[in-house]
Amino acid sequence: MPPLKDGRLLAGVQAINQCEGIEPFVKDRVSNDIGTREPLKDWASIDWKLIKKRVRNLRQRIYRATQNGQWNKVRSLMKLMLRSYSNLLLSVRRATQENQGKETAGIDGQTATTPKSRVALVNEIREYTLWKVRPTKRVYIPKSNGKQRPLGIPTIKDRVAQAVMKNALEPSWEAKFERHSYGFRPGRSCHDAIEQCHARLNKQCKDEWVLDADIRGAFDNISHEFILKAIGEIPGRELIKQWLKAGYVESQVFHETKSGTPQGGIISPLLANIALDGIDHLLAGFYKVRIYYSTPKAKRQRTTKQKLSRYGFIRYADDFIVTAETKEDIEGIIPILKQWLAERGLELNEEKTNVVRVEDGFNFLGFKIQQFRGSCLTIPQKEKVKAFLQEIRYWLKAHKHTSQEAVIKYLNPIIRGFGNYYKHGTSKQVFSYIDSQIWKILWKWSLSRHPEKGKKWVARKYYRTINRRKWQFSAEVTDRRGKKEAKAIFRLMDILIERHVKVKDTASPDNPLLTKYWKDRQTTYGKTYWEKGSKYYTVAENQEWKCTVCGEHLFNGEELHTHHKVRVKDGGTDEAENLVHLHKACHKQVHSKCSEKLEA
């Protein structure tokens, strides 16, 4: 650990010393969980199908026990999960291979980016009887508004421990979380939140006003005491307390943390969701009575009264909106929400919290949501479109001498990613605008590279007619087999606009009764990932949308790679028969085994 400067934080040093080795964590890992007590020797030898099956089954048991109110059984199953060797192996994989910050070290400077280092990490953690929580390393990343967002990066061992703890704690809370919470939860996404906005604010609903709420520094200010009270006396509670109180090191100076959960920790989003859970239940206590008549002339006969919630609610992490029929209803709920947040150490950001008419629109998760002639429109946010185009301009300006092929290779995934995010909204007109702007940007870039040449010469060099489309910015590329073909800039207008199918109410992947529902849902998403009839679609269909290494669904949230069964340099082809889709971590495992052979 880096030395701490000056003596003004003596109490902080003492706090670190108190965190050194006080919490039992992984002692007595059961031998029948993996079948052996021998130390792990080879990362590539792990049977991920078996490992994931064991962890999934245990998560489902915790979920069902929570649903049934069997709290002693929940505690016992949580203890079993914390001792599970399979959970440890899967947690190491997620912290060192699947997590976006896998290559970022904590204050100890350690990472585990190779199979050998992962094996050493597993064997080291496996022998621990007392856990040593270390402070996080403070780093900053830029925000969209130009400010800096602070992150707290735990050590790699703490990240693994947090992943282990998350698998024990998360399924129990998944059985209790409110239905309209969509952020940082398994099987849920931004698009589910946007689709719920669309469903709530369509012409059948009479809500005309929205509270567009912003919580001031939610992750940094959540009350530790409230989180600990909310999770109760569960196994590993003291370890969670240590993570909350661990502090952080910035410029070799230790700082205490008296509130908040560090952004950068694997368990932090779950703890934030636990703290913010309950707004939906709070609002459900306010209802309105609606009277239905059998016919307009029979108002005194056959009347039906129905209690309806006065408010609509959608939350994604710390961003949420509340809808109601009148402005008075919205203004009346604000003081109640403020009091509710204050109990958690939080407050609304008055500058960014707005009360607006739905007809005027509001921004939420990158979309502008607005009622127009009785319909709810979800349009790409103007500021996001500008920022996207500006990013392309800046990159081309900085790469004026880059080849056409490199430009296409860099821009196409970015353009396709932007389109895939917004394809579930009212985006066709915006897509057309962006395509035309990108064409203009590339035309100016092409001209600037050859100031002494005429426009006709530039057009012949950079533009082709492809599939009857004229003036396509393109380049002739050679594949690994020496075959030449023309590659063009991807067009957003080629993306099919289709509504996202929202997740059902409280549905969770941990519910064993919904296994088929989640499999079908993942397959439905996969069928929109590749064009139907394409080579990659056929490959996925042939392998029944499952990774052939770990047995999990291809679209379980992990990054995908396409593997050649027979390498191209050994005579293999790029045809569907020689390809198989794998999760990125599974793909690396295959390449670590020289003799690995996959079935079709």
Question: Which residues does each predicted region cover?
Answer:
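Non-catalytic, polymerase-adjacent accessory regions of viral genome-replication enzymes
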Residues: 1-119
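Conserved polymerase palm-domain catalytic core
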Residues: 124, 129, 176-180, 184-188, ...
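Non-catalytic, peripheral interaction segments enriched in hydrophobic/basic residues
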Residues: 403, 407-464
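Acidic catalytic cores of enzymes that act on phosphate-bearing nucleotides/polynucleotides
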Residues: 444-446, 453-526
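Short, charged surface segments at domain edges that flank catalytic/cofactor-binding sites
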Residues: 507-549, 573
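Histidine-centered nuclease catalytic patch
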Residues: 551-584, 590-599
